[in-house]
Amino acid sequence: MELIRYADINSDLYRHIWVVGDIHGCYSLLLTRLAQLNFSPDTDLLISTGDNIDRGKENLETLRLLNTPWFISVVGNHEAMALDAFETQDGNFWYVNGGYWYDSVTEKDRQEATELLLTFKQRPHIIEVETSSKKYVIAHADYPDDSYDYGKQVDIDSVLWSRDRLLGSLQGNIHPIRGADTFIFGHMIVDYTTTFANQIYIDTGSFCSGNLSFFKIK
C-alpha cells in the first residue's frame, strides 16, 4: 500500500513563492505567464499542483522543469496514471485521458520522459509551506480530512482524484479544514481562481482555455 508523502519548504530561502495550477503540457504558456509575473529562477520558487502532462502539446518540455532548482511539483492523477501504466504495462486508461503523446515522441524522448515521470514515485503528494504569518498546504485534488496534520496518512485516491469537497462547496456545503491557514488545489477545472472557506482552487483549464492561474504565497 502506497503511503502519502509529505514535503515541507523553507520559505526563507526564496524571494517569492508561487503556486501554479495544472500545466498539462502548456510549457510556452507557462513561460509567458512567468515573464508577466517577473518570476526570477535565481530567487523564486514555483510549486505545481500536479498534472504537468497530457492534453497539451509540450509535455517533455514541461517535465524537464523537474530538473531545475526553481520548480517542484506534487503528484497529480495524470502522473499517477502514467506510473500505473508503466507498472501494469497497460497504458489504455492513461492514453484515453491524454497520455497518447507518449507514443508519438521519439524513442530517445520517450526514455527521457519515462525517467522524469518515474521520479514521481518519490515526489510528494502534499507540500507544506510556512511563512512568517501563515501555513499553506498544496495538494492536487483535496486534503480528505477535516483537520490537517503534517505526515497524517489520508486516502491517497482522494488526494489525487476527489472532486467531492469542491462539488459540495459549489452547492453551499462549505467547511474549512483545520490545521493550516490556506489549502491550494488543482484538478477540477474552474472558470477562475475560486475560494471556499480556506480552500483555493486554481486549475483554470490551461489546455482548453489558455488561462494558467497562479497563487502567490510570498
Curated annotation (Swiss-Prot):
Q: What is its EC number?
A: 3.1.3.16
Note the superkingdom of the native organism: Bacteria
Q: Which residues form the active site?
A: 78
Which cofactors does the annotated protein need, by name? Answer: Mn(2+)
Give residues annotated as binding Mn(2+) 1: 22, 24, 51
GO annotations under biological process?
Answer: RNA decapping
Q: How is its activity regulated?
A: Inhibited by cadmium, copper, zinc when added activity but with less efficiency.
Organism the protein comes from: Salmonella typhimurium (strain LT2 / SGSC1412 / ATCC 700720)
| Record-listed Mn(2+) 2 binding positions | 51, 77, 187
Functionally, this protein is described as follows: Can hydrolyze phosphorylated Ser-, Thr- or Tyr-substrates in vitro. The natural substrate is unknown.
How temperature affects activity?
A: Optimum temperature is 30-37 degrees Celsius.
Family membership: Belongs to the PPP phosphatase family. PP-1 subfamily.
Keywords tagged on the record: Hydrolase, Manganese, Metal-binding, Protein phosphatase
Q: What else is known?
A: Neither magnesium nor calcium stimulates activity.
Write down what this protein is called. Serine/threonine-protein phosphatase 2
One annotated GO molecular function is: phosphatase activity
Has UniProt tagged this entry with the keyword Metal-binding? Answer: yes
Instruction: Describe the pH profile of activity.
Output: Optimum pH is 7.5-8.5.
| Reaction catalyzed | O-phospho-L-seryl-[protein] + H2O = L-seryl-[protein] + phosphate; O-phospho-L-threonyl-[protein] + H2O = L-threonyl-[protein] + phosphate
One GO CC term of this entry?
cytoplasm
InterPro entries, alphabetized: Ap4A_hydrolase, Calcineurin-like_PHP_ApaH, Metallo-depent_PP-like
